[in-house]
Amino acid sequence: MSARYLVVATKEELYLPIAKKERNRIPIVTGVGGTNVIKALRDLPRDADILNVGYCGSPCFPVGEVICVQYTKLLHPGVHFKEDIFELRGSSSGVTCLTSGDFVTDPHGIPPNSIVDMELAYIAAFGFEKTSAVKYVSDNLNLNEYETCLKK
């Protein structure tokens, strides 16, 4: 049986309700963004069972909504080439998590039924096939909303 990990970007995300329920998983705090994910997870076996819990933004869902993610891919606004889409385990929600290298504040180009984060597609692209994800909508692609959410 492969090891089970709870992967979050920040220590604060360890206190989200779903994360608190996952005490049987080994916690890994990666830091925010793709480069930090790569550094933190590069030595894990690719058959590791990963649950990614964290914050996301979305123009499609209300702040406070809890989302089980079915798909993830990189977000490259203005780039028109085919991106790999990764299907995650444990969800049939139809929700896609778009992973960006920057905080996204413009909802233009964000498809319906989508959320935006800064880590998930990197985890999936790294070859971790036993990955599932639960995201908390912290903002509607608004930096002030996000910062207010973190203060709660």
Residue ranges: model-predicted function:
Residues E13-K152:
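Glycine-rich phosphate- or other oxyanion-binding loops that anchor nucleotides, phosphorylated ligands
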